[in-house]
Amino acid sequence: IRPYIVVLKSNVNKKQLNEFEEKYLRNRNSVLCLMDNIADLEASLKLSSIYLELNPQNHFYSLDILNALAMGNAVVSWENDVNRELLPKEYHNYLTGNGDIKRLIQTLTNLLKMNAQERNFTGRTSRNYVLNNFNIKNMEELLIDAYSTLSFRKAS
């Protein structure tokens, strides 16, 4: 079993998440690691299958979320326009209302109940989504096409 890693950027909801962690560790259904600070996020993402982003002020593209998706992690986060764009449509139900701890815990519970095949499919879908939509090569080709079209129109 790959461990589940929850990254806490603030301590606001730490108590509820610790209680949630104890429930799963006691039943030994899975492993959930709560971490305040991670020295090497990339190494942690290679080992994990769930990445939780609890930063409510996330009105910019999060490189951490993109890295987590690219590493095949399911991303659970607060719902906002930016995060809806970062996550594949199939997984928008992993986005919860800001501060809605009950919904957050229900989402994590559902992910922890997934079998290995479902979890692997989720990871592959997330990875492919990032590679296809946030790839520098794809963006470069779109920019070249746009400039070519503009240059051609100007020349005519």
Question: What are the roles of these predicted feature ranges?
Answer:
Residues 116-148:
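A charged, aromatic-enriched C-terminal amphipathic alpha-helix characteristic of glycosyltransferases
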Residues 42, 63-70, 84-85:
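Short alpha-helical segment that forms part of, or immediately flanks, the ligand-binding pocket
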Residues 37-48, 70:
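Short acidic alpha-helix that forms the nucleotide-activated donor recognition element
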Residues 89, 93-101, 111-116:
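Conserved acidic donor-binding segment of nucleotide-sugar-dependent glycosyltransferases
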Residues 46-60, 73:
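Acidic donor-binding loop of glycosyltransferase active sites
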Residues 2-17:
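Glycosyltransferase donor-sugar binding loop
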Residues 56, 73, 77-84, 98-99:
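Short glycine-rich donor-binding/catalytic loop of glycosyltransferases
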Residues 17-37:
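Nucleotide-activated donor-binding/catalytic signature segment of Leloir-type glycosyltransferases, i.e.
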